[in-house]
Amino acid sequence: LIKKEMYKNDIAMISVGGLSFKRYLELAQKLDKKVVVITDNDKDYKKNITDQYADYISSSIQVYAPKEEDQYTLEVSLYKCNDEFLDKYLQTPQMRNGTQDYMLKNKAEAAFRILNILEEDNRYSEFNIPAHIERAYKWIS
C-alpha cells in the first residue's frame, strides 16, 4: 500500500484525542487543508461517524472508520484482517484469552510486537491493512 514514506508524499500523521480533536478539524476547514480522519466506530457507525462528523465532511476533509460495527476499534480491525498471521506470530501460551484480547488490553505492547515481527522477519506482504485505512491513505495521497 505505502510505497514510500508518508512525508515524501507531504503527508503528516498526528494522533489527536479528546476535546482537541474537533478543533483540529475546525482549523483544517479554515486553512482549507486536506485532512483524513481515521477513527474507531465504537460499535455505532451512524452515531459516532456519520452524525458526529457531518458538519466537517467536505472535499478537503474525509472520515474513515470500519462500517462493520464488530470492528469497533483499531486492534479488532487489525485482528479480523490478520487473525491467522497474528495467532501464528504474536500469540504466546500466556495469552489465555486469545490474541485479540491481548491486543485490546495491551495496545502499545501489541503494536510494538507486531511492528517487530513485520520488520525483523520482513513479513509485510503477509500483513493485511484494514480496508478503511487503505481507503483513507488512497484518498489523502
Regions found by a protein language model. Name each.
Residues 2-141:
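Acidic, Mg2+-coordinating catalytic modules of nucleic-acid enzymes
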